[in-house]
Regions:
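Short, solvent-exposed loop/turn and secondary-structure capping segments
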Residues: 49-52, 206, 336-338, 381-382
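Polybasic, glycine- and aromatic-enriched phosphate-binding surface used to engage nucleic acids
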Residues: 20, 27, 125-371
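Extended hydrophobic/Leu-rich segments
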Residues: 112, 246-249, 254-261, 385-388, ...
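Juxtamembrane/interface motifs at transmembrane-helix termini
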Residues: 59-60, 207, 342-345, 385-391
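Signature of N6-adenine DNA methyltransferases within the class I
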Residues: 1-180, 302-309, 315-316, 344-347
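A generic secondary-structure signal for well-formed alpha-helical elements
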Residues: 30, 34, 44-45, 58-66, ...
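Non-catalytic DNA-recognition/assembly elements of restriction-modification systems
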Residues: 355-427
């Protein structure tokens, strides 16, 4: 059906993605080889992984108009901006990259007339070779995606005070923005710490939230509502009713609230939570701008990893430090950025496309990276973040401290030896 070998919808997609093969077919049938053509596309088409093969066929796009500020969305979804582009078939070697001049930036809300004269066009750098890490990017012990503990207004708490009373977090997406956050009391046995990508700084975990979850008392690897006390049972029934009422996708086979939270065993796969695993567990943010932030969860031994984060249980603390050091190394910034699934998401790609060697205890280089990482971790923990609001500002403060101390230079020197084909050359 799809001889172009482009994406037509994932395994669990609710509909077939026909836009990509439709454009390919229309151009082949109705346009000559060098004809220009224009399309309204979701902005994700410029970077997202499902459009990768499509971009290989039509690699050059000229932006005609940014339609993201239109009051009526052209494509479904609460945040699906789109653009009007034109393009033509070109050879891979003719591709271009657009960037702002050094030291300048072009605001996302800038008009095209303002942005166009400031854009510098250049040939793209050669792509980094792609090869999955062993065992971090594939196999039974690879990095795993965190759970999907949503909606926040039903099951997530910012702070859990000592008096036992709580109010859930206000959701900010979809119909859940209209849902009044639930509140309750006396559920301390069912409230568990949670870490997400937003808690990751380089070499440091900052803050946490709490989730209301029915962890089984009889089987430490499962969730079970029926085993919980009456107070929890009443709360969960109320949450279940709200879940069905506000469920954004209206369909007959709506999963229960627990089934939604346990999507692909996101929570139970992490159970049982053991204190001994804390120093061996590595976590990094699955989405963000350009920067990957990795840290050990040493001070949060019983925290469940939530969405927007990937985690890995290392065999020992040295391996965990080694991984954190490699993932935070500034010299891998370009390779990690190039590996992204889309403009927003890293997903598993930093370890799926960059061949990080498996940790070898007897390797002097691996041991040196782990030791430098330990020093970075100590400095990151001591860095004063008082008065700094927002993750970007806190991240910059930690990076500045590591750079000024010379630790980043030492880390880069070691990682360049480890991954010479993926590290940026020293200026």
């Amino acid at each position: 059906m799809n001889h172009y070998q482009v994406w037509t919808g994932g395994k669990n997609a609710t509909h077939c993605q026909i836009a990509i093969p439709f454009i390919c077919e229309a151009v082949d049938k109705f346009l000559s080889g060098n004809s220009r053509h224009g399309w309204v596309l979701p902005v994700s088409a410029l970077k997202a992984q499902p459009w990768a093969k499509f971009r290989a066929i039509y690699p050059r796009w000229n932006l005609i108009a940014d339609l993201s500020e239109m009051e009526e969305r052209i494509f479904p979804g609460p945040n699906q901006p789109c653009i009007l582009v034109s393009g033509k078939r070109l050879q891979f070697s003719e591709r271009e990259i657009w960037r702002a001049p050094p030291g300048e930036s072009i605001l996302t809300d800038a008009t095209w007339d303002h942005a166009k004269p400031r854009i510098q066009i250049a040939a793209p750098p050669p792509p980094f070779p792609e090869q999955a890490s062993e065992p971090y990017g594939k196999g039974p012990r690879k990095f795993l995606k965190g759970a999907k503990i949503v909606p926040y207004s039903l099951v997530m708490i910012d702070e859990y005070p000592g008096d036992g009373r709580f109010t859930c977090v206000q959701s900010t997406t979809g119909y859940w923005r209209e849902q009044q956050p639930m509140s309750g009391a006396q559920l301390s046995d069912n409230i568990h710490p949670v870490l997400a990508g937003e808690n990751c700084l380089p070499f440091r975990i900052e803050g946490q939230r709490f989730a209301i979850l029915p962890l089984s008392r009889e089987n430490p690897r499962q969730l079970c509502v029926k085993e919980q006390g009456q107070q929890f049972q009443r709360y969960w029934k109320k949450a279940e009713r709200a879940w069905k009422e506000y469920r954004e996708i209206k369909q007959s086979n709506i999963p229960t609230l627990l089934e939604n939270i346990e999507y692909r065993r996101g929570v139970s796969a992490q159970l049982p939570l053991r204190r001994r695993d804390a120093g061996r567990r590595v976590i990094y943010n699955s989405s963000g701008g350009r920067l990957l932030r990795a840290a050990r969860t040493a001070k949060s031994p019983e925290a469940i990893i939530n969405k927007d984060a990937y985690y890995y249980i290392a065999r020992n603390q040295k391996e965990a430090l080694y991984l954190v050091g490699v993932l935070n190394a500034p010299c891998l910034g370009d390779a990690i950025f190039q590996s992204k699934t889309s403009n927003l998401h890293f997903d598993l790609n930093p370890v799926k496309k960059i061949p990080i060697p498996a940790f070898r205890p007897k390797s002097k280089l691996h041991g040196r990276i782990a030791e430098i990482s330990r020093q970075c971790e100590k400095l990151a923990q001591k860095t004063d973040l008082t008065g700094l609001r927002g993750q970007p500002n806190r991240t910059k403060a930690v990076q500045r401290a590591l750079r000024e101390s010379g630790l980043f230079d030492k880390l880069d020197a070691a990682v360049r030896k480890l991954l010479p084909n993926h590290a940026q050359k020293k200026p």
